[in-house]
A protein has these predicted regions:
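Nucleic-acid endo/exonuclease domains
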Residues: 1-121
Length: 121
């Protein structure tokens, strides 16, 4: 068993987030990402952050944004987070919760397209 380099608090927060997923994240996880041939992890620690969904083979982070992300301070935090993730070689794509709830097929298609592009298929 590999030893984690993440703080116990971060790991506990990730577990809690996996248990209490918002409706859009739950829908994308169970009805969308599970249909793809690529392996995704949900609520995955990366550095000091917990990303919504992570595909290791493509080094892709998928983030879902609810209404709280409309706030200027939240947008600034998202920008810093994205810059950090970019700096460690990860690409970040974002979707609004509304898009997942109203156009799941389109969101999943785009995620699959980006994964395939990044892994060269």
């Amino acid at each position: 068993m590999s030893q984690s380099t993440y703080s116990p608090k971060l790991i506990a927060n990730a577990r809690s987030l996996r248990r209490d997923m918002p409706p859009a994240e739950r829908r994308l996880w169970f009805d969308g990402l599970s249909t793809l041939p690529h392996k995704f992890r949900r609520q995955r620690p990366v550095g000091v952050y917990i990303v919504d969904f992570y595909c290791a083979v493509a080094k892709l982070v998928t983030e879902l944004d609810g209404a709280t992300h409309d706030d200027p301070q939240a947008q600034q935090r998202d920008l810093l987070r994205t810059k950090y993730l970019d700096s460690v070689g990860l690409q970040v794509i974002r979707f609004a919760n509304h898009d997942v709830m109203t156009n799941l097929e389109g969101v999943v298609f785009e995620i699959d397209r980006v994964v395939r592009e990044r892994i060269g298929r």
